[in-house]
């Protein structure tokens, strides 16, 4: 399993003059297109969307450390370069973690959909191969969505912690194997 993206919302606790800061920070700001300043932190590997209210969204991180480094850098840049005054410590909340998974064996999506319909741990299943080649499996706990593909590849989305995709993979593997389908490879 590999984490592909972590998205976090942040309250920086201070108003930001986006017109001024976009020039100083060399960010992208086109208020008629989008109300936030797009600030790329290429050395960290994240993109930050900064809003006038001091709210911010950080995306592109592969781990929490990158989120916190990004928040620290943005606060420092806004404070030192743009003169923004902050009122307290930033509040960071993970909104979504996306992970990719490889089961290393082809998945029989028709059978998986059939056997997991009505399972107590499954909130919902969508599988319409004419519309989309993957099976969408929504779990109750952890509350995530898994996209399973015939190739054995999968994507987990909606996680709030790094452990949730691992728990989801384990739970799905156990359920599938319980019904006699093999996932070892």
Swiss-Prot record:
Keywords for the protein's UniProt record, in alphabetical order: DNA-binding, Repeat, Transcription, Transcription regulation
Residue ranges of the TM segments: none
Biological process according to GO: DNA-templated transcription initiation
Cited Pfam families: TBP (PF00352)
Role, per record: General factor that plays a role in the activation of archaeal genes transcribed by RNA polymerase. Binds specifically to the TATA box promoter element which lies close to the position of transcription initiation.
Assigned protein family: Belongs to the TBP family.
Alphabetical list of PANTHER family matching this protein: TATA-BOX BINDING PROTEIN
Protein name: TATA-box-binding protein
Gene: tbp
């Amino acid at each position: 399993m590999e984490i592909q993206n972590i998205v976090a919302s942040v309250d920086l606790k201070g108003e930001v003059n986006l017109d001024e800061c976009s020039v100083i920070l060399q960010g992208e700001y086109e208020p008629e297109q989008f109300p936030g300043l797009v600030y790329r932190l290429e050395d960290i590997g994240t993109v930050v969307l900064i809003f006038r209210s001091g709210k911010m969204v950080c995306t592109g991180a592969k781990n929490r450390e990158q989120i916190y480094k990004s928040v620290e850098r943005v606060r420092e840049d806004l404070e030192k370069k743009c003169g923004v005054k902050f009122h307290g410590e930033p509040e960071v909340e993970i909104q979504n973690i996306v992970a990719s998974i490889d089961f290393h064996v082809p998945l029989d999506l028709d059978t998986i959909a059939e056997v997991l319909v009505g399972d107590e741990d499954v909130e919902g299943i969508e599988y319409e191969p004419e519309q989309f080649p993957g099976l969408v499996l929504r779990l109750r706990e952890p509350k995530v969505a898994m996209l399973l593909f015939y190739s054995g590849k999968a994507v987990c989305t909606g996680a709030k912690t790094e452990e949730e995709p691992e728990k989801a993979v384990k739970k799905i593997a156990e359920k599938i194997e319980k019904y006699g389908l093999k996932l070892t490879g």
